[in-house]
């Protein structure tokens, strides 16, 4: 447990947490986006909320041992990006497809109790939108959509520079949109946008389209590397996924008319292999003139996104409070 009386006056040092059903990332960072240390650990399947809390504490203790050895100040706040149906106002996670045992879990209050620090918490897609707004492709952009791809496909939305929360206090569940009567499901429904274009969905799509091409234990990152190295089967899979993403974004573009759409991790690793089919499908589905279409880009942060998502909620709180 951290003690408030141990803080250095005027310090703004952040203990960041990025959590989904596959991996826990803890980082020590600053409001300027510098990450001094980071540790990651796999998250066991079918794990309880209390067990994940213990894992967070163990990893945080290890991280702070490293930072204290470097004489870095004690963090004065906790920032967390969490997957699932997280209400940012109450800090309660109602449910999450990648944490099936979790129901109405008081994530923020439990983190605050254990760390004895103020905690700012956001759904992962919203945290991604904030990371891009402050440090990535969204700098200087007032209206943007960030596409979070793990574990389901969600939209983090900023309108006129303000982060949008739906009535449940979370990010838009864009992935529920059905694009076909059948197809990959990922952690959503068959034929949904999550099924075609989320990280889990794209892996499933690869095995559906090319069942003999990869070993059963291959992961998505290997298939991404194959596409980057010119494998036509892998490139075809990601072209289909990008096309479906572009189709699925069309209603959002008509509704919000954003300036910019940013593809999150891991789709950003594919660059134009994924983005070009998405752009073409979006243009065809909206039937808008090129001048009226938003720019659609892979995240320039890309591999740094997970660590910056971890600290972005606290940075947003610091900046909005200082502006008031």
Question: Where do the protein language model's features map onto the residues?
Answer:
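Active-site neighborhood for divalent-cation/phosphate handling
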Residues: 86, 108-139
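A cytosolic small-molecule/anion-sensing beta-strand core signal
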Residues: 31, 82, 159-160
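Hydrophobic "anchor" residues
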Residues: 34-35, 93, 163-164
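Glycine-rich phosphate-binding loop of actin/hexokinase-like ATP-binding domains
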Residues: 140-197
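ATP-binding/phosphotransfer module of carbohydrate and carboxylate kinases, centering on a glycine-rich
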Residues: 1-74, 88-90, 113-115, 135-137, ...
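Short hydrophobic alpha-helix segments
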Residues: 38-41, 97, 167
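Short glycine-aspartate micro-motif
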Residues: 14-18, 75-79, 143-148, 154-156
């Amino acid at each position: 447990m951290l003690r408030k009386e141990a803080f250095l006056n005027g310090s703004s040092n952040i203990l960041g947490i990025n959590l989904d059903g596959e991996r826990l990332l803890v980082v020590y960072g600053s409001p300027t986006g510098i990450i001094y240390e980071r540790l990651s650990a796999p998250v066991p399947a079918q794990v309880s909320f209390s067990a994940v809390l213990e894992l967070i504490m163990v990893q945080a203790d290890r991280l702070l041992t490293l930072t204290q050895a470097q004489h870095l100040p004690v963090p004065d706040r906790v920032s967390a990006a969490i997957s699932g149906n997280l209400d940012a106002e109450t800090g309660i996670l109602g449910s999450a497809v990648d944490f099936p045992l979790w129901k109405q879990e008081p994530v923020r209050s439990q983190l605050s109790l254990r760390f004895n620090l103020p905690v700012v918490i956001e759904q992962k897609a919203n945290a991604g939108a904030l990371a891009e707004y402050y440090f990535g492709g969204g700098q200087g952009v007032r209206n943007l959509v960030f596409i979070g791809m793990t574990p389901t496909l969600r939209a983090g939305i900023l309108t006129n520079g303000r982060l949008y929360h739906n009535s449940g206090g979370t990010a838009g569940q864009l992935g529920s949109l059905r694009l076909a009567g059948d197809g990959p499901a990922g952690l959503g429904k068959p034929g949904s946008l999550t099924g075609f274009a989320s990280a889990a969905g794209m892996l499933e799509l690869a095995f559906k389209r090319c069942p003999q091409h990869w070993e059963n234990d291959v992961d998505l990152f290997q298939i991404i590397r194959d596409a980057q190295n010119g494998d036509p089967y892998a490139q075809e899979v990601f072209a289909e996924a990008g096309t479906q993403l572009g189709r699925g974004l069309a209603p959002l573009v008509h509704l919000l008319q954003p300036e910019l759409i940013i593809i999150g991790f891991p789709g950003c690793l594919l660059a134009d292999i994924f983005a070009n089919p998405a752009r073409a499908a979006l243009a065809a589905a909206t039937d808008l003139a090129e001048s009226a279409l938003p720019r659609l880009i892979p995240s320039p942060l890309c591999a740094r996104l997970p660590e910056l998502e971890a600290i972005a909620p606290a940075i947003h709180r610091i900046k909005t409070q200082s502006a008031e």
